Amino acid sequence: QDRVSVIHNYCQGAGIEIKTLRHDENGCINLNDAERARGSCAVYVEQPNPIGVVDDGYPSLKEIIGDNTALIVGIQPISLGLLEAPGNYGADIVIGEGQPLGSPITGGGPIYGIFGCTKPYLRLMPGRIVGRSIDVDGKEAYCLTLSTREQHIRRHRATSNICTNETLIALMGAM
C-alpha cells in the first residue's frame, strides 16, 4: 500500500485522475474491469498483489489495455526466483525495493530502488543505471552506464543527485 500512497500523492498534485480496478473473488484483478484502463497513460499492478495473491491474469492485462498504455509492475525481487519475470508478460516498467537483495537495514541503510524498463523509456529514467559488461581481461564487470555528463558536472541539469554510498549499495545488489 505504500507505493499506492506515493502514486496518489504525486498524481493528486499534478491533477491526474486515478482509477482503481476491481478484484475478483480470488483476489486477482478483474480482467473485465481492466477494459476501463484502455487509453490511460499507465496501469500499475503489483506481483504478488497488495493482498499477497500471485495474480495469474497479468499476462492478459497488457493485451487488454493495449500497447499505448504503459504496464508498470511493482515487484518483490526475491519472489522472481519463483514467479515469471514481468517483462515476459508485457511490463513496460518494473520497480521494486533492493533491500532484500543483501542490504541489511541493520547496517543503518542506505537502501536502493530497482527500476527497469523497455527501450522506449530507457533515456527517461532518473538516477544511475548499472550495466553489465566485459572488462579488458574478458571478466564480467559492472559499471554505471548511459549517464550523461550533466549527471556529474552540472547539478542543475541532472535528473538525479545521489551520493556514493547509495551507488556502492546499488552496484552490490546488481552483482
Model-derived features with residue positions:
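Buried hydrophobic positions in well-ordered alpha/beta secondary-structure cores of metabolic enzymes
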Residues: 7-8, 34, 43, 76, ...
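A glycine-rich helix N-cap at a beta->alpha junction
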Residues: 10-21
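Conserved active-site segment immediately N-terminal to the catalytic lysine
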Residues: 87-103
